[in-house]
Amino acid sequence: RPAGSEPIPLVFVASAGGGIRAAYWTTIVLNCLVKNQDNAGWKPIGMDMNNVCTHRMSMDSVFLASGISGGSLGLAVTKAFKDAPAVPWSEPLGKDFLGPTVAGVAFRDLPNAFVRLRATGQDSAAVLEKSWEKSVRDAKGDLESGFLATAWSTPARLDFPLLALSGTSVTDGCRVTVSALKLADADAA
């Protein structure tokens, strides 16, 4: 930092799982903490956020944001809108994501379980992911560039916050963390 300037806080964010509710609250809390957001007239939970959010910081102060499940989605959406301060980050998460998923289960997966047709198209998880991507894209955000591509603003400069998104492997139940950071040696696992 330049001599005589204010210290820059180093912030780590952890976001718990809990589905779309965790994603929504993650974006609301981060929107409240980051000072480059314009909250004029924004009342996501029935209150004026400018009266609630009094201490703001720069998004670049957040070094690493880690989450699991819905918390990971909230962090990814937040990063997708990092440079779009006019859009409340939680806006894309207020859409109907259950409808397309239920339709896929009811009209493709369930009949296929009985008649063993080779159903083409996406499975329910892919339908849900595509609906998240579409919702963010409709709000002028970007979830589709690729996870690692968004970590670098230029080939020589990381774009903060770095994300460490966790999940569980369906094959063995072990935790899986995806990040642009090298968090452990592959041989240590």
PLM segments and residue spans:
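Catalytic domains of lipid- and phosphate-ester/thioester hydrolases
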Residues: 1-189
